[in-house]
């Protein structure tokens, strides 16, 4: 009788093990070989009053095994200055984590920022991923650049934007930092982007809207972006992004601030997510399109892609 009674128990244990096995696999779904480092865009931050710039993304990646670090650089400055600041933090993360390399992911102006690091220190990173980044410039930046340089209008606007950057920096890090909105504008317009690309061409497509080299100097390049400025009527940022999308010429597909073709770098995962520029980092507060995959899921899938590539 005792032997018979063990059979159902054994079956139960076996079934429980089978049921549990997907959970065990899921726990390492985002466990990349090297840590993931996130780099914010213009007027970005790491955390303000408990709210992450990368809303819900770091915790979702960590939950299934990823080692994630969130960086903060100048809210407003040139790609090179921001890149040098990020490089210093990457070197610190490498020392802290004990890993020789990190996977960099940059949103918006964070895209050119991580490209700078990849170009000058490719030994520190196996991959560079850009999300909604204006690698060939932004029509919105070109529109703003029409304000005459040195004019009173430029001085007033740059002063206001610098003040906003200083406030964001203070709320996030306790210091106003150095803000250079004109430096950001020069980096993000078409002419400035072309100059940057001439110095750091790695991963940039040679055609108007194609893909770039998938791998350069040991660094794998990836990108994705959205193409829908208006996605959720409850999201207060949609009104601003809907207005800014009007600066794009000839019906150019865009996310409200960046054209889809300009966002291409290396392997293009996708450039037509139903997301706007802030949806790409799951903002504002996760109010994204109900008819598109969650931005958090996109980051999780990419972490798994990096894992499967042994990165």
UniProtKB/Swiss-Prot annotation:
Cleavable signal peptide: 1-26
Protein's name according to its UniProt entry: Triacylglycerol lipase
Active site per database record: 108, 255, 277
Gene name, Swiss-Prot/TrEMBL: lipL
InterPro entries (alphabetical): AB_hydrolase_1, AB_hydrolase_fold
EC number: 3.1.1.3
Binding site for Ca(2+): 235, 279, 283, 287
Names of required cofactors: Ca(2+)
The protein's assembly and partners: Monomer.
Keywords: Calcium, Disulfide bond, Hydrolase, Lipid degradation, Lipid metabolism, Metal-binding, Secreted, Signal
A GO biological-process term: lipid catabolic process
Single GO molecular function: triacylglycerol lipase activity
One GO cellular component, as annotated: extracellular region
Disulfide bonds: 209-261
Sequence positions that bind substrate: 42, 109
One protein family per Pfam: Abhydrolase_1
UniProt record similarity statement: Belongs to the AB hydrolase superfamily. Pseudomonas lipase family.
Localization, UniProt: Secreted
Protein task: Catalyzes the hydrolysis of triacylglycerol. Also able to catalyze, in anhydrous organic solvents, intramolecular transesterification of omega-hydroxyfatty acid esters to form macrocyclic lactones. This biosynthesis is dependent on the chain length of the substrates, and the formation of monomer lactone is maximum with methyl 18-hydroxyoctadecanoate. With shorter substrates, monomer lactone decreases and the formation of diolide (dimer lactone) increases.
